[in-house]
């Protein structure tokens, strides 16, 4: 049953596990100093990742939305990627925050869960994965084998979500490090604001920002949106 309470709870657990794995890879790369060299905006964030403890990463992973992205807002990219997959075409890949064999299983599971949500929980897939409605439709049409091939061909498209918003990441790690649940809830609110802006831009509509006066955003609130 679409959007049943059990389905949403299971999806939230899945999202948290994906976030944990993604953050662990990001922290490992930050400690090795071989990540984000070309992203000057992340210079201030790398120290937070490099010294993050397991408990800090675990708390940060509680964000009710995926902290990973695979061009989920780029309708044109997905249309071209699917066509290229069928034709065998290739193009030059852009620099990614994730690389190496460890990223492939993570990207595969991210896309598989996004595909599953697009097919059975389409009304919440935009919130949880940040998918534009048209991307949701495209992903839902794929087969598991299509996903396997796409991951291998386009692994470098796996990126941190809101990669160009370093302030969000700084707020997230500060709140997770300080063991401050109220600050974490404010970060969740920031997530919703960023998501609202993304969805509004894909539809060509102005976005009215959510204000703190509406109360803190918890996982249950985000799930019910």
Q: Model-flagged regions — what are they?
A:
Residues 1-84, 222:
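Structure-specific DNA junction-binding interface
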Residues 4, 15-19, 96, 100-103, ...:
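Intrinsic-disorder-associated interaction segments
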Residues 29-36, 117-121, 145, 153, ...:
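Surface-exposed polar/charged interaction patches
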Residues 44, 146, 167-168:
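Exposed alpha-helical structural elements
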Residues 57-72, 153-194:
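Long, compositionally biased
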Residues 61-113:
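Aromatic-anchored, charged helix-turn/loop surface patch used as a conserved interaction hotspot
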Residues 103, 107-156:
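Amphipathic alpha-helical packing elements
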Residues 172-225:
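Short, functional C-terminal segments
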